[in-house]
Amino acid sequence: MAKLSLIQREEKREKLVAKYAKKYAELKATIDDQSKSEEERYAARLALQQLPRNAYPTRLRARCGITGRPRGTFRKFGLGRTKIRELAFRGDIPGVVKASW
C-alpha cells in the first residue's frame, strides 16, 4: 500500500491539472499556431512557464485505485496488476477469465 501522503499528492495534482486545463490548452494552441506572430508565441511561452509546476498533465501518475501502487496499473480497470489478478480469480471483474489453451 502506498503512503497516504503520496496518494493525496496525486489527487492534488489532478485537481490542479483540471483547474488549469483550459488555459494550458489555449496557450499550447497559440504556441503551435504558425500563423501567429513570433511575439505572440513567445508571450504564450512565457505565460505557460508561469503556470504552477503541478498544472502540467505530464506530471500525473496513474495509480491503482485500491492500493495506490504507481507501477503496473491498467488504464482500462484503474487497478494495479496484483489487484486485477486477485479480483479476476475471485470473479469480481465481469468478462475476465484466466487464459487456457
Swiss-Prot record:
| NCBIfam families found in the cross-reference section | PRK08881.1 (NF006477)
| Function in brief | Binds 16S rRNA, required for the assembly of 30S particles and may also be responsible for determining the conformation of the 16S rRNA at the A site.
Family, according to the entry, reads as follows: Belongs to the universal ribosomal protein uS14 family.
Where are the coiled-coil regions? none
Q: Which PANTHER family does this one have?
A: 30S RIBOSOMAL PROTEIN S14, SMALL RIBOSOMAL SUBUNIT PROTEIN US14M
Its BP terms in the Gene Ontology are: translation
One GO cellular component from the entry? cytoplasm
Quote the subunit structure annotation.
Answer: Part of the 30S ribosomal subunit. Contacts proteins S3 and S10.
In terms of InterPro entries, this protein maps to:
Ribosomal_uS14, Ribosomal_uS14_bac/plastid
Instruction: Give the UniProt keywords, A-Z.
Output: Ribonucleoprotein, Ribosomal protein, RNA-binding, rRNA-binding
User: Which domain of life, per UniProt?
Assistant: Bacteria
- Listed GO MF terms: rRNA binding; structural constituent of ribosome
Q: Does the keyword rRNA processing apply?
A: no
Which Gene3D superfamilies does this UniProt record tie to the protein? 1.10.287.1480
Report the protein name in the record. Answer: Small ribosomal subunit protein uS14
